[in-house]
Amino acid sequence: RRRPWHHRAVMTPEPKELQELVRELHQQAAPWQPAGLGSRLNWGPPVMGASATVSCRRLSGIVEHSPGDFTVTALAGTPLVELQAELARHRQWLAVDWPWGSGPNGQASGSLGGLVARGLAGGLRQRYLGVRDQIIGLELIRSDGTRARAGGKVVKNVAGYDLMRLMAGSWGSLGLISSLTLRTMPEPPQRRGLKLAGPLEALGPLASWLLGSSLSPERIDWWRPPARQEDDAGLLISLASINAHTLDEQIGCIAAKAAPLAITAQTLEPAELASLVGQSQGSETGSSDWLLRLAVRPNQATALLADPALAGLPLVLGAGSGLGMAWATASALPTYKVEALRRHCQQAGGYLTVLRQPASSQLPAWLDAPSRPLIEAIKRQFDPKQQLSRGRL
């Protein structure tokens, strides 16, 4: 006889059982948290109290791919690496970075639903925006078991647009995402990169010029990979086009601008670029004690990078967005330095979110924002019994 669902710490229902399970949990007012493949459930604030986990691991697969319309519909538990592999067969891709800690080739990238629920954009946001801007439709199961839909299967459909944006970055606190329709992009046939090294006081103006220029890099990232922790942060630039001549012109333009500023510019072939981008995204999800989400106004990025608290730490920060990650072992980053970094980010018009921290540290994942009353009001509308991911929003 099967053990009742509500007695299980982790529930992995079949797709046909999912809605009924959520209804049962609602009737019991039982706390629970949605999950994809569970690879990053320990990110962010811990869920308050005992809480079951409802996994979408079996809710997996591509429902429909329309290459001519550049759209794909997939179930929320679909591994991101499998979705990208299928799109690549049609020379398309979902223009998002692998989540931090995915490892080489994205094998530990987690699920599509988890990617959207976290809503954390990487360097590719510079050209393609974040994942929330690529969602054109979704289906979710609300806390009472009701199915809800927003958007559609065509890019021009804007019905339910606000709901889609709400779900991106909701950390599983508003509902369980069951399927998603996203906009795909043609895979660029040509891609090369540039690695720029030099003093921050020279790199800062160059980054500002590049952001305001007519060039359109895929990424312009401040970065310091784990292998170069003794060095200052540099710039990692990715360029993509339909032909090699255009890339040569763009690389030449940037290199010519860099030379008088005593900035060295190293051209990167596709494999070299992919390797360096991979280094800036962490090797695996459990490879460090601290994982910090940094955010500042873009014009404050160089001041943040010069902060002694960040000295020697691997990091990546979008030059155009001011958003990024830093990570470290507990011995390399004392708690008081994280608190100092948080104050710096706030003074620079941003914030610091602690996604993961050592067991010996008890810092709040994030601080209260002025918008908290509005966020809590939205939460009550979606989850009146406060069952979903308690403490995560």
Features from the language model and the residues they span:
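C-terminal substrate-binding/cap subdomain adjacent to the FAD-binding core in PCMH-type
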Residues: 117, 136-285
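Conserved glycine-rich FAD pyrophosphate-binding loop
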Residues: 46-49, 57, 102-107, 261-393
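N-terminal glycine-rich flavin-associated loop
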Residues: 10-34, 56-106, 120-153, 188-200
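Short, conserved charged micro-motifs
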Residues: 81-83, 201-206, 243-253, 300-307, ...
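Short beta-strand
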Residues: 33-34, 219-226, 315-319, 354
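Glycine-rich beta-strand-to-loop/alpha-helix junction loops that act as flexible
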Residues: 34-40
